[in-house]
Amino acid sequence: MRKRMASLAVAGSAALFAMTATQAPGADHAAPPGEGSAIFAAACAGCHGSDLSGGRGPSLFDPRLFTRLTDPQIHEAIEKGVKDSEMPPFGGTLDSAQIGAVIAYLHSRSAELAGGATATTGAPASAAVVRPPPNPDGQRIHSQTQDFQIETLVDHLDTPYGLAFLPDGRLLVSERTPTGNLRLIDPSGRQPPPRITGLPAIHQGQDAGLLDVAVGPNYARDGWIYLAYSDSDPSLPEPPPPAPGTPGFQIKRKPSMTVIVRGKIDAANRWTAQQEIFRAPWSVYTPSGAHYGSRILFDGKGHLFFSIGERGDMKNAQNLATPLGKIHRVNLDGSIPADNPFVRTAGALPSIWSYGHRNPEGLAIDPRTGLIWESEHGPVGGDEINLIERGANYGWGVVSKGMQPGIDAVSAPGMVDPAAWYFPTIAPSGIGFYEGNRYAGWKGSLFVCALRGQQLRRLTIKGRHVVDQEIVFSDLGRVRAIATGPDGLLYVLMTDPTGPGWNVDFTNPVRGRLVRLNPITWQQVEFKFQ
């Protein structure tokens, strides 16, 4: 435990580990005053937020929580975790008195917020937490090697997730909405973006929906477009909608799973000729609403890579018999390459390329080296940038640079350490290499989109290593995906912030936009001031 504290070297996590290291779990002692607040800040606020807005998880200060659950039920959820969710068991980290202190803090803070005052300012809670969303349009940014201006091309997208350019310069944008929209966008803005009709039935909820979109490498010849989306068993009825204030672990969900398909778009903007590339058996489907992963990548050698998260159960990541928590490699038609690493491993899925992943949301190939890079959400901190290699184990379920009950090791023999990792969390999503010539100093850089951090990061890659990085911009909205257009410019999908301080639950649809980064040269700057 003390070794783990030193490895993290972060105040919030160190506070939690210091408290939990003083006494063995289950020891009978009275929690000192204020301990519940400190434990909550270190272990809970990262997911549940610190006010009524909540975070990735629901607010634990909602007074309705205590009308639907008894204190013993809340205690059990903290101690044992919640099946089919991201809530891990804390029983091995916190003793009974410490859990009780957290519950006492939930009661007191809930009453405080319900009374309309915040702990720090005394201002009305609603006034303290609600802010207007930022507007990135027109923002001039000065980065280390390039000045640019953000231009909004399309506004009011509905929770956009993936983007991919067609050869003619138009681009496809997937929207992770209740209906799952695929938009065909003209970057010039000359026409409203039409919606592609005839898509497959898409399961939506929490992380689910229409996810990535990718244009096949031979599109000019065969017209194939690839989609990743969440699917549920149509033979099962939809559970009734939960009553307002229902605790997350009491919400009933249909089992669901990531599916990869390809199809074509005809002249009437209809999805046609669909073929399945990957579909798991019904037994793999899970009611969890978390960690679908779902990015698609082509390697230029006739292979398709795609990512699937472990769906909130870290045991899946180390199990080669399940597709969950893996990067997969198939041929363009979904067949299995003969040289995949586990083709001859008894009980293993032959599509697996690498394993030990939590929630991989970014995949990119370095055009200079052919090496594949990945971004991955950690638990509380411990987000990763990984170099993905054949048959490698990236450790989730056994090791983590973040805070996860049940995991004490930060590294282990036979498990690959990340090339870069982040604490506190930035929630990395889409990534992409830039190989154009429109931005001086950016050629060869890996760009990383960050959700919680509301950041676009630029990483300098040399061979197999991350040698430097900068935050290109931040605090302008959640940054979801990035792509280089045929014009050599960078296009970015962004959404309004969610969670604490924004009065928007992260599970709700949220307004998004497509922006372009227009380079500013020194000649333009000098002309402006003449």
List each language-model region with its residue ranges.
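Bacterial N-terminal signal peptides
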Residues: 9-20
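Electrostatic cytochrome c docking/interface patches
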Residues: 22-39, 292, 349
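Extracytoplasmic electron-transfer domains, predominantly the class I c-type cytochrome c fold
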Residues: 46, 51-56, 61-113, 209, ...
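Acidic, Gly/Ser/Thr-rich repeat motifs that build Ca2+-stabilized beta-propeller blades
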Residues: 95, 99, 109-314, 362-365, ...
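Surface-exposed loop and turn segments in beta-propeller and other repeat-based domains
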Residues: 194-208, 273-291, 332-353, 396-423
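Repeat-solenoid scaffold signature
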Residues: 348-384
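Conserved blade-ending motifs and adjacent loop-strand segments that build the rim/top face
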Residues: 357, 466-486
